[in-house]
Amino acid sequence: MVARSRKRRAAPQDIYPTCKIAGNCPADIQNKFENKTIADKILQYGSLGVFFGGLGISSAGGSGGRLGYTPLSGGGGRVIAAAPVRPPITTESVGPLDIVPEVADPGGPTLVSLHELPAETPYVSSTNVTGDGAAEPLPAGHGGSQISDVTSGTSGTVSRTHINNPVFEAPMTGDQDVSDVHVFAHSESSITINQTENTGGELIEMVPLRHPPRSEGDFRETSFSTSTPIPDRSALRSINVASRRYQQVQVENPAFLNRPRELVQFENTFDNPAFVDDEQLSLLFEQDLDTVVATPDPAFQDVVRLSRPSFTQSRAGRVRVSRLGRTLTMQTRSGKAFGPAKHFYYELSSIAEGPEPDILIPESEQETSFTDATSKDTQQEAEVYADGSTLETDTSADENLTLVFSDRGRGQGSHVPIPGKSTIGGPVNIGDSKYYTLNPGETTSFEADVISPVFIFEGNADGTYYLEEPLRKKRRKSIFLLADGSVAVYAE
């Protein structure tokens, strides 16, 4: 026997409208739509003894019933709702009504009597009669007074008004003169306009602004190297470009310094002299990852942004021009593109220190001032010669010379005569003065190998003079302190 397959019936909401008309609805479907199930009957019979409608259960608004919700921990008490406070009404002081003054006397007569006022006579201060002197005849009239208007022949008062409008200024071109307009108004309602040419004033010619002249060596040192310095530090200085985050790329093409755009993309354009592209700013490039585009320099492949240049110094001491580059090499399904960051740099030639200039200074003796013995008032500077320039010259310029020592503190001076060639090597006489003197008049013959003693003359703080310095040896010195403050040293 073959088992019959059970067919699935339609949904209850599709069966009930049809079977209700035919009257053959299944019991379960009819009880469900007509609320006659066992659960519905329990609620219907139970609701007869218990009422839960005021608690807001089921589909009610949840207002908490007629008394509302109360705290669980609070004691039973009545909640008093605060009523709004009515604003006070401002009261004004009320007084008696104002008494209106009476215009007419109630007890007076009804008719008002009229009073005649005297005629007003015009007052004339002075009379000026003009004309030929004939009086005009008056018209004949009947009784009563006749009043005639008398007009004086005096001239009216003239007023002058000069109006300047500070808001409006007339345009001036070239050497045009400004004129003043004067308006004269008379009492006879006549206006006279007088225009006066104003030829005075000073005409200042406009000249271009000139800077004061400067000398060739007048330069002002500043702490910045550009006309508009930027106080912010460079972005590359705050970022460690030597880290592993950036790929180091050294550029050999010198166009990287002033024309970096030519290294990223080909440009079939001509140079426009009216447009100057600022290569000192950040540069942006458009790259499509779907298409592969060749670049002039393979190192700049897929570059979409180049930062502004920054000048740094490498560890080797060379000047380096750096730019940070952003590349896009990969793209996700969501459209997010990313790529490695690169550090492009171009190293300039190192600046070596220049050689120091060789300055040849001829060796010469110390300059000494000499004064001729015949003239003590005139002082002449001696010329400086090299050591070998006077070896073969026979001159007698050093005959009868005097070495002058001056005391600046006391204003005194002493003269020490220096013997000539004929007396060199002779004895030295020590006189009563404070300096050792050499008398050229006294001569004595001696052997050629005999060396004369060496005397050292020391005065004040002006300096020390050594006689026959090449022959001086280390010997014991005797120091003499004189009464005037000078020091004499004798070497044995």
UniProtKB/Swiss-Prot annotation:
Residues 211-230 are annotated as: Disordered. Pfam families: Late_protein_L2. Keywords: Capsid protein, Cytoplasmic inwards viral transport, Disulfide bond, DNA-binding, Host endosome, Host Golgi apparatus, Host nucleus, Host-virus interaction, Late protein, Microtubular inwards viral transport, Phosphoprotein, Viral penetration into host nucleus, Virion, Virus entry into host cell. GO terms for cellular component: host cell; host cell endosome; host cell Golgi apparatus; host cell nucleus; viral capsid. A motif (Nuclear localization signal) lies at residues 2-10, 473-478. The keyword DNA-binding applies. GO terms for molecular function: DNA binding; structural molecule activity. It is found in: Virion; Host nucleus; Host early endosome; Host Golgi apparatus. One of its GO terms (biological process) is microtubule-dependent intracellular transport of viral material towards nucleus. Highly phosphorylated. The keyword Lipid metabolism does not apply. Disulfide bonds join 19-25. Minor protein of the capsid that localizes along the inner surface of the virion, within the central cavities beneath the L1 pentamers. Plays a role in capsid stabilization through interaction with the major capsid protein L1. Once the virion enters the host cell, L2 escorts the genomic DNA into the nucleus by promoting escape from the endosomal compartments and traffic through the host Golgi network. Interacts with major capsid protein L1. Interacts with E2; this interaction inhibits E2 transcriptional activity but not the DNA replication function E2. Interacts with host GADD45GIP1. Interacts with host HSPA8; this interaction is required for L2 nuclear translocation. Interacts with host importins KPNB2 and KPNB3. Forms a complex with importin alpha2-beta1 heterodimers via interaction with the importin alpha2 adapter. Interacts with host DYNLT1; this interaction is essential for virus intracellular transport during entry. Belongs to the papillomaviridae L2 protein family. This is Minor capsid protein L2. It comes from Cottontail rabbit papillomavirus (strain Kansas) (CRPV).
